[in-house]
């Protein structure tokens, strides 16, 4: 099912949590990396974002997180035009979004436990209230025995699983994940997928950028497919 700059999928236009309308994006004076992107995601939906390297997946996620700015078109987040959001208000909105970056962005001076708990601490949570939940989550991603370790002593796969745990610990309104299973084995990949599905069942809107075709096929979730910076598919896996 294809989309264009003026058409939105019928099942996503009811109070979308995220909406792109004719969006283009470029870095500096370079050619556009995103071209005429239009779609809308309803609250509580689950989508994969697919496409070859360089198709624009990471750039699209950066727009949603307000790490980059569109060169044209309109991006709405929680019903608000991102370009109209005051800089002082952006940190609050970002706290409603859980993000798994490819580069992890862990704090080296904190333990795995404290890295995972950081969003709860920033939100004003008390350690006595969240200690058990954080420990349980770290156990779920296979880091129970490593919760007191510093990031420098973790493997690439362990760092990735820690970054995922940190992104979901606060049950965000939106979860954005950029290649979240790229450094883990199939067993952990399926466990991570189940974690995302459970979070989605609790109401979080999930958007996962991935090259993992097996993960997409196993999930049965709808796909946003990018080719050359254009949105070429909206629908179930394998339907164009």
Where are these regions (language model features)?
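Helix-to-loop junction immediately C-terminal to a conserved catalytic motif
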Residues: 65
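Short coil-to-helix segment of the ABC ATPase nucleotide-binding domain corresponding to the Q-loop/switch region
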Residues: 110-118
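ABC ATPase NBD coupling module
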Residues: 28, 82-98, 199-201
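Conserved ABC transporter NBD signature motif
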Residues: 73-81
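Catalytic Walker B motif of ABC-type/P-loop ATPase nucleotide-binding domains
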Residues: 175-178
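Conserved ABC ATPase signature
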Residues: 150-154, 158
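Conserved signature/switch motifs of ABC ATPase nucleotide-binding domains
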Residues: 149, 170, 202
């Amino acid at each position: 099912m294809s989309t264009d700059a003026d058409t939105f999928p019928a099942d996503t236009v009811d109070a979308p949590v995220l909406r792109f309308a004719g969006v283009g994006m470029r870095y500096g004076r370079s050619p556009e990396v995103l071209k005429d992107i239009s779609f809308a995601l309803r609250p509580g939906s689950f989508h994969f974002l697919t496409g070859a390297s360089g198709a624009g997946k990471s750039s699209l996620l950066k727009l949603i997180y307000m790490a980059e700015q569109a060169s044209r078109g309109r991006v709405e987040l929680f019903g608000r035009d991102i370009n109209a959001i005051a800089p002082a208000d952006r940190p609050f909105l970002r706290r409603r979004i859980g993000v798994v970056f490819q580069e992890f962005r862990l704090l080296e001076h904190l333990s795995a436990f404290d890295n995972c708990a950081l969003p709860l601490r920033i939100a004003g949570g008390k350690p006595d209230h969240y200690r058990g939940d954080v420990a349980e989550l770290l156990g779920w991603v296979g880091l129970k025995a490593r919760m007191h370790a510093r990031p420098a002593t973790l493997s690439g796969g362990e760092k990735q699983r820690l970054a995922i745990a940190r992104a979901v610990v606060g049950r965000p309104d939106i979860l954005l994940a950029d290649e979240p299973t790229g450094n883990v084995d199939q067993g952990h990949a399926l466990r991570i997928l189940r974690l995302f599905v459970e979070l989605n069942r609790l109401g979080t809107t999930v958007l996962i950028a991935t090259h993992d075709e097996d993960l997409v096929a196993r999930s049965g979730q709808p796909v946003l497919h990018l080719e050359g910076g254009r949105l070429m598919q909206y629908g179930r896996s394998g339907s164009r």
